[in-house]
């Protein structure tokens, strides 16, 4: 009986019904062989195994010796443990492959010879296929002469034909997997499994993220419509499947893209060094290409609705399609914008070099254009709800739309405000030149927050605000402002001169302590820290606390010895001097807190665990006080947040043992914090410490650093277990929740279960850490508050 030889092409998947139809149609010999070997495979693998047997017996166009090896290796992979030893390649030489029964009798074999013959022997029947030498694409040879080089391929179809069967796909994928560098082999194996599942299940979504890949195989499943490739190391992509509708590639190393499928609807390429784009499909609706290195864009498709080109190097934009609804182009080098489509609803062009904006469409409801060079704004659409134009050069604003909900105009040159819409919920005019305010401000809702900090408001205006907001029944907005108004600009001294005023003079013959601060003056934010030191000398602590100067001198001595701590402290100084002296004091507290944590992480308390726990307790108490202060701020109508935070810290310094806090502040009387508030806060902090501190310190980063140094083996074992717990939980959630719901490959769903898996693994890690913490810290955790 001759072999049942057809076209050599089978569908991408074969149902059980199709298997039996093939098996009972004149029973070709490979099916007789199948009856003898199907028990080698579990029921879930039998379909794929039969597909592979069929392909071995009917080699498709382009078959190479490597393909034959891959097909027999695939059968070994699919077989039950133990039965894979019955599937051989190279038993009688490198060109002989066979499958044996339980008595070691041959069921099926394939032999290749140097003449280019591919011979299949199966149950007494033999069929030879003629192979050709692939010397050039599309060229066929008639044999393999001795000494010739090249690859034998079957000669039925051109060698460039794409895979048609799962076995053909698997051959290509397996070869790609075996060619992996050592560090990439695990990732490629995982991706091959995903592609097999995608092909066998008919899943239209393929996600191959975070696998450490530098390449992809030459062929991807042809049927997929969504391809997601986040966080690998790809420098290029293979030819894309023709039916693709959505392509998302983030966090790779792509500098260019292949030809895009004509039916592509959504293209998202972000966080790559991409320098240019190919021609875009005419039906493209969504183009997100932010975080690349693009300097220009191609012609945009007429039906494009969303365009995100933020974080590139664009100096201009092409003509915008009439259907465009959303345009995000922040952080580029744009100096102007083209005409905006009439239906545009969202426009984000912040962090550019725009000196003006074009006419705004009537449908626009969101406009973000902060950090540009705008000196004026065009007329605003009546339906605009968000206007974010901070960090420009505006001296005035146009009439504000009645629907406006959010207005951010900080860091401009405004001297006055127009009438404010009654429905406004957020107003930030931080750092402008306002001396007075519109009457409409006090008529805003009680749900509205207003930030007036950094403006030179007149004393008359401040007094009026105090009277209005403190009146019985006041139901207007919450207003934040500077108690002493904005500080006037002042000259910044050289850092070593500012430091010298605080440092102890040198003894005779010794170098001046301030000398080494000469070189620190070249570091980032040194000017800000110099100004901060000068402002410290104007605070209540300098005036009233005789030991304050010595404290600062000691602090500066540590900063001089620690580059990392100095860099963090200098950076914090940039926000410390923008208003009143209490702000300077508050930021000093923040800097001292950073110092405490830094010392713990560096190992200062490795041999003084009591001091480590004491530092942790102080951080816990300060954190609780901050929560209490934030709640208090919400109850005040006219408030300087700094004064509220500082009031709790300053007045509870002694009762809560806050070593990083100073003893004086200037504006406590107008902070809004009462004696009752302070008493309640003290009780709340102490109660919270008693019930929560053991769990809190278990999660404290500096404690982890100490444990890693003192018990590295135990901590490392717990870290490794945390990683394996995460992977196991993620797989379980994927199998039990995503797969049944058809959400495998859905980025949002996978991110959600990833967060749950991470949280579960973290809890297990902390549970494992608890005995070590109890063992090492012991009684230090049992310290109780003394009765007053």
From Swiss-Prot:
EC number, as in UniProt: 2.3.2.27
InterPro entries: Leu-rich_rpt, Leu-rich_rpt_typical-subtyp, LRR-bact_E3_ubiq_ligases, LRR_dom_sf, NEL_dom
Active site: 580 (glycyl thioester intermediate)
Pfam families attached to this UniProt entry: NEL (PF14496)
Stretches that traverse the bilayer: none
Chain segments carrying region Interaction with host membrane and with target proteins: 1-481
Region entry Linker, spans: 482-491
Post-translational modification: Ubiquitinated in the presence of host E1 ubiquitin-activating enzyme UBA1, E2 ubiquitin-conjugating enzyme UBE2D2 and ubiquitin.
GO terms of molecular function: catalytic activity; ubiquitin protein ligase activity; ubiquitin-protein transferase activity
Subcellular location: Secreted; Host cytoplasm; Host apical cell membrane
Predominant location: secreted
Gene Ontology cellular component annotations, sorted alphabetically: extracellular region; host cell cytoplasm; host cell plasma membrane; membrane
PANTHER family: OLIGODENDROCYTE-MYELIN GLYCOPROTEIN, PTHR47114
UniProt remark on domains: The LRR (leucine-rich repeat) domain is involved in autoinhibition of the enzyme activity by interacting with the catalytic domain.
Protein name: E3 ubiquitin-protein ligase SspH2
Primary gene name: sspH2
